[in-house]
Amino acid sequence: MICLKILRFYQKFLSPLKPAACRYYPSCSEYALWQFQKKNFFLAFLSTFFRILRCNPFFKGGFDYPKVSKNFYPMNLCFKPMFLAKKQLCFLYIPYKNKSFYLIKIIFKRTNQ
C-alpha cells in the first residue's frame, strides 16, 4: 500500500530532521502506520487525522494506542505449538470493549542464545 511506503519514508528521512515533539506514545507516524496495517484505508485515515488534530499543546498527551475491532474465533484444540512465536508475533490485542481491542506492537529483537 502506498500509504505505508509514504509513512516509512517520512519516518526514515524526514522525521529525524526535526526534534521529537509528539505528545503521545506511540508517535503520530507510528500510530498511523499501525492503523493503515490493521484497518481499511478510510477508517485508518480518519483515525490518523483525528490523532494529528489532538497532538497539540491544548491536549495532555500520554499513551494513546490504536483501537481496532476484530472477531476472534475459537482455535482447534489439536494444533502444533509454534516454538518460533517471537519471530512471528507482531501485535498484541488487549481487550477494550466488546469486540474492540487496543493494538500494542511488540518491539523486541530476537537474540541468539
From Swiss-Prot:
What is this protein's function? Could be involved in insertion of integral membrane proteins into the membrane.
Tell me the organism's taxonomic lineage. Bacteria, Pseudomonadati, Campylobacterota, Epsilonproteobacteria, Campylobacterales
Spell out the protein name for this chain: Putative membrane protein insertion efficiency factor
The record's similarity note reads:
Belongs to the UPF0161 family.
State the HAMAP family in the record: UPF0161_YidD
Location in the cell reads: Cell inner membrane
Keywords attached to this Swiss-Prot or TrEMBL record, sorted alphabetically, are: Cell inner membrane, Cell membrane, Membrane
| Organism annotation | Campylobacter jejuni subsp. doylei (strain ATCC BAA-1458 / RM4099 / 269.97)
**Record keywords: Secreted included?**
no
Q: Tell me a GO cellular component.
A: plasma membrane
Q: Which Pfam families match?
A: YidD
Describe its membrane topology.
Answer: Peripheral membrane protein
